[in-house]
């Protein structure tokens, strides 16, 4: 009798392990989105103003996220010497007409101490405002290797971002619990949970959604795309069951934003297709103001991130309506970059947008529907 080959035993063991992990995910009904809030026109006339969130406290500042909690905008971002450096930390600030002084709320040392494991670096944060008033913060950390070996950590605040709980590590993958990253905001579900867009960079670049209950139990994990060139999905729902996702494209030119659709609240997604929107391998942000149109912030370029624009449209037709930042000079000793937008809508009807300004600062724009509709 021939012995069983080692590779067969290895594959069988992996299959059993993966199957057991899948069984640990609770059985649940299909998700249902909370319907988008209908925000009436303010009838105040056009309003637009700009503010600095960060002011060169660190050499670089990047990957901001914004959320509204109890009517107050709160922003987070990471800053330090440069992306991936050991001194990079997560910072937070809140807005009440002006932005408060940035506060460091997490770094590799505090994360390492809380998790009891070595942390090499931290990165991308994203905020989520729970319906019960909690403010959640997801951010990535790496123990060994690059971003492809990331894990997601979670903290929360009960006082509009003034104080935060110690981080916990979410278990999102059966394979060493690595290669899951966040960038964009989650969507609220009718059962109180959240559908969090995530992506992977290990053995490819592809997008997923992670469905979490209000107590952070992993309820489901759904693949959005496959392959090596689609990441950082930005998702918004159109009603209780349908949603659109726009994905950053990192493949061969021409660079275009990828789009996907779901008709069952993210239980299944269509095959990604290229839109007509340019994408220079850069993140986008999408929201549904609830007025019959969608709003998208993007770098509408095939190369470079020196222009940041707003587009209005529907599922498959988009029009650039505003150019927010643009630098056309070519004789500079550096490249300008206005990138990684994050948008949200307040109960007062104002749209808030934060983004990386030239890799050095975080900038905030506040505007209303009337300003968007100006020619």
Predicted regions and their residues:
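Asp-box/BNR beta-propeller blade signature and adjacent active/binding-site loops
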Residues: 4-375
